[in-house]
């Protein structure tokens, strides 16, 4: 399997507080990494470092065979003043994907003309997850992807992520919930000083 990413001796601090230090791991195509830890342990910071949105205090991230990374964080990155359909039109959609299948599965097909600001939190979360479903990325980085989702939507998400692994894509996600996805684990509570 091809190596997608390697973290070498990563450390991250905010002011004087060390969130984690000396963290090293590799991720290969078709593998998943579940990041665990208590609130404030640095899960979101680690995912942002992996995505290139935040710099580590120390250490490096090496990316191999990675042309595109898709990050979905707590803030859903949707344009609140646009409709769901307008937000979708801003994406580079993989041409082999039938958008209508995902809209129907996520129960968004009747909400295309609704402004994002008028959606519930769960509906906004599902709209943001469309980025993952429609994007042709080598590495999917998801920060608490199940927060705000109902059971059916969680099952759809897990099924999709399992399919992505089979398609040789790499996954990194944080979740307080156990997800039905075969993955390795990093517990940030065990890599702090």
Task: Please report, for each region that a protein language model flagged, where it lies by residue.
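Conserved ABC ATPase signature
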Residues: 115-122
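Conserved structural motif at the start of ABC-family nucleotide-binding domains
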Residues: 5-7, 19-22
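Catalytic Walker B motif of ABC-type/P-loop ATPase nucleotide-binding domains
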Residues: 140-144
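Hydrophobic anchor residue at the start of the ABC signature
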Residues: 129, 168
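Helix-to-loop junction immediately C-terminal to a conserved catalytic motif
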Residues: 51
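Conserved ABC ATPase "signature" region
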Residues: 97-112, 133
């Amino acid at each position: 399997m091809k190596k997608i990413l390697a973290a070498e001796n990563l450390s991250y601090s905010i002011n004087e507080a060390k969130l984690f230090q000396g963290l090293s791991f590799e991720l290969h195509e078709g593998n998943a990494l579940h990041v665990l830890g208590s609130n404030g342990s640095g899960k979101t910071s680690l995912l942002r470092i992996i995505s290139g949105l935040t710099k580590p205090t120390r250490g490096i991230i090496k990316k191999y065979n990675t042309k595109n990374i898709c990050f979905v964080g707590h803030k859903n990155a949707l344009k609140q003043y646009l409709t769901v359909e307008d937000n979708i039109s801003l994406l580079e959609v993989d041409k082999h994907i039938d958008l209508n299948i995902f809209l129907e599965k996520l129960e968004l097909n009747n909400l295309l003309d609704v402004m994002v600001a008028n959606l519930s939190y769960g509906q906004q979360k599902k709209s943001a997850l469309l980025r993952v479903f429609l994007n042709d990325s080598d590495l999917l980085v998801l920060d608490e992807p199940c927060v705000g989702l109902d059971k059916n939507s969680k099952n759809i998400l897990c099924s999709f992520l399992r399919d992505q692994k089979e398609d040789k894509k790499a996954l990194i996600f944080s979740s307080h919930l156990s997800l039905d996805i075969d993955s390795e684990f990093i517990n940030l509570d065990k890599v702090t000083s």
